[in-house]
Amino acid sequence: MPFKKLKTINGGCMREYISIIGGGLAGCEAAYQIAKRGIKVKLYEMKPDKFSPAHSNTNLAEIVCSNSFKSNLHTNACGLLKEELRLLDSLLIKTADEVAVPAGQALAVDREKFAEEVTKKIESLENVEIIRKEVGKSGDNLVVDENLKSVTDASGVKSQPIVSLKKLVEEGIVIIATGPLTSDSLSKEIVELTGDEGLHFYDAAAPIIEKESIDMNIAFWGDRYSQERGKDEELESWKKRIKNNSENNYINLPMNKEEYENFWKELTQAEVVELHEFEKREIFEGCMPIEIMAKRGIDTLRFGPLKPVGFTDPRTGKRPYAVVQLRQDNSEGNLFNMVGFQTNLKFGEQKRVFSLIPGLENAEFVKYGVMHRNTFINSPELLDETYNLKTNNNVFFAGQITGVEGYVESIASGLIAALNAVMMYDKDRVIFPKETMIGALSKYIATPNKNFQPMNANFGILPQLEERIKDKKLKYTKLADRAIKYMGNTMNNLDNLF
């Protein structure tokens, strides 16, 4: 291997600080967990010197896809994971709770306020030094000044320096949390570090619409199932009941069969941004572009993100043929994103096709959907259950670059990597029980898998119950109760360790 393992005393690095590369969700959570335990952190973030194609502001923990952290219910896998993280004093979940916007039983945030608050909190930590420089592989022809203020290329042009990953690894413990948009320069050094070229995939972001441009004569407010007219419910009683749904969580856009089929036809024929063949093969199912999903069949969307189950159209008193949902995107309640409408359509086509949806004829799109490149390593071959690199114990990975998929999952991986980076000083490890969601995820990414793919939190990765339960809700409740019980025991052990 090009990088040699740093000699340690008692299994721990001799440096007095831990370096974290990447100021996203995983990196910020890791910084907090390490700093609160009295160890200094150097947090490297390349913004504002350099931005990825999807990022646009200088704050840490910037959210570029959906503003939803998914369900808060314990009977939902991601809801369970959030509850575990709350027990573990997750800074980012606490902040998300503080800046939450209405989203029914889900946790959705005002993305701007979330990033601002996380940035303020990290900046206020005495043990954290934020270094606004890119980490990666410097060119052989670059001359770096002694104070790391500039680099000069062969033509004499000065620019911001690139901090060497190799040097950081040689000096001490490093957590690489650079996310799905890891720079090309750093990707090259990661290849040298791991000896593995990793994998690439794409996910997509949905458009955001100005609320005032939505035709509320067609659209209606309400949550799935609670808005629906009961089987024996009188029409007038139902209308009176749903009248109280005003300004309640989701805006729903009903479609009849003719409207849906026309929309589907135009969507499947719309122009998209061209991808390379290898990119097309690597689209992650959990964030599949709606136009790709639509091409799988005319009814695919009606059984997916546009399913009408649980709704009644106030205009007809009947279930719609299909329903498009819009979710509040900011605390002011003036912006709404299109649920499940991650897309790679050209901007002009998005305006044309999505305006065919009843209620969006005059929609003002404040942000169009875009595709993002995502990079993740072959974690089952490279990492153990603590997100520690098997070939170099002073290197940890965290976040979506490890193959965990989702905001909450990324935060969880950052927390685990941080705890174990701290424990490296005492030659010990923190492994969460596989019965917990946080433990099951870390076990998944470390388990050999020839067809390794990104994974969200889900009950399928937990050990099954001894008793067989057919009722899905009851089964998930028991799995969640068991996880919280195991987490309680783990908390006692953590108190002894720290």
Task: Identify the meaning behind each predicted range.
Residues 137, 401, 420-498:
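Glycine- and aromatic-enriched mobile tails/lids
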Residues 15-26:
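Beta1/beta-strand and adjacent pyrophosphate-binding region of the FAD-binding site
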Residues 127-146, 161-326, 336-347, 351-352:
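Predominantly flavin-linked oxidoreductase catalytic cores and closely associated redox partners
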Residues 337-404, 411-413, 429-446, 452-458, ...:
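A glycine-rich dinucleotide-binding beta-alpha-beta segment and adjacent secondary-structure elements
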Residues 409-424:
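An active-site-proximal "capping" alpha-helix that borders the catalytic cofactor pocket
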Residues 32-94, 435-438, 442:
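N-terminal FAD cofactor-binding segment of flavoenzymes
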Residues 56, 72-119, 123, 127:
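A conserved beta-strand/loop capping segment in the N-terminal third of enzymes
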Residues 1-13, 140-170:
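Intrinsic disorder/low-complexity segments
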